[in-house]
Amino acid sequence: MRRKQARFMATLCRPSVSVPEHVITMEETLELARSRHADHPQLPLALRLIENTGVKTRHIVQPIEETLKHPGFEERNKIYVSEAKARVPSVVQRALDDAELLTTDIDVIIYVSCTGFMMPSLTAWLINEMSFDATTRQIPIAQLGCAAGGAAINRAHDFCMAYPKANALIVACEFCSLCYQPTDIGVGSLLSNGLFGDGIAAAVVRGRGGEGIELERNGSYLIPKTEEWIMYDVRATGFHFLLDKRVPATMEPLAPALQDLAGLHGWDAADLDFYIVHAGGPRILDDLSKFLQVDPHAFRFSRATLTEYGNIASAVVLDALRRLFDEGGAQDRARGLLAGFGPGITAEMALGRWRTDEEAV
């Protein structure tokens, strides 16, 4: 009698998420816009767009009075570094605990962030500070913006498939409030000022065992000739975020990419059990529901993140997944889709099945 050959599938485990203690409400955001831009000819439009985001609260690393100041790019980046070092380790530790692993079990750290810069990457500091093994690989990703959460999941999946039984740690650290530019007063900038928040998330992809999403396939898609639709203009004052007015409509060309990926796997993107996607704004979720022909309730986790935290960039997809875990997870072998959207315009997509915490054999 032949023994069943062991199969090792990468499993995305429960994410750990933390947001800073300073909170700003939509009402406070609207009042700030009115008081600081009272003479702006398009203020009514900006206020309406901010209200339409549905973002009720956002969390930021500094009190709003400090956030509104601009001490210079150098000082802001120092704040990014100090806040990341103060806040990331506890989030990482919770993710490791949830995955029932130690730092010495991790083979690669994938660190994503687009709101500050460090060299060496925070990965090097984490390896030293938290006693990861010195042979731990480092993959910092700095220029995929909001798509980086999905990209990190996909690169972790790739790594665990290339090295069976390996374990990957994903860390997303985004302090969007440190990118506030008081001189940027275009409608797109005013909208961004009411949309983005700060947050940190971490999750482990286990090469063997664990409860969560057993990753089966991933893919990427870039909408041609849209690289200027979401971008940074890097100046002496730091990162100036540019958002084209055509961005909210990008789900119409991206939905077919999601359908194609599912089709390659023999699945129907309109008939899955759970959806974990980046919520850049409410229209993204509304249009995904429309073009994928999926009940809006399917995107409740992503919408809750947007409502309670705002757009926390690469950390959104991990927080949405955390909410699925908090709801009790999905049925064993339930099928689902994960996706991050960001500059490029890029979609990073993954398909997987829910699995309980049993050894895959």
What are these regions (language model features)?
Residues 79, 90, 95-97, 231-306:
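A contiguous, well-structured pocket-lining segment that forms one wall/lid of small-molecule binding clefts
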Residues 118-124, 170-191, 219-236, 282-290, ...:
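Active-site-adjacent elements of ketosynthase-type condensing enzymes
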Residues 61, 83-99, 155, 200, ...:
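Short, well-ordered amphipathic alpha-helical segments that serve as non-catalytic structural scaffolds
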Residues 13-16, 112, 142, 168-174, ...:
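Short beta-strand segments
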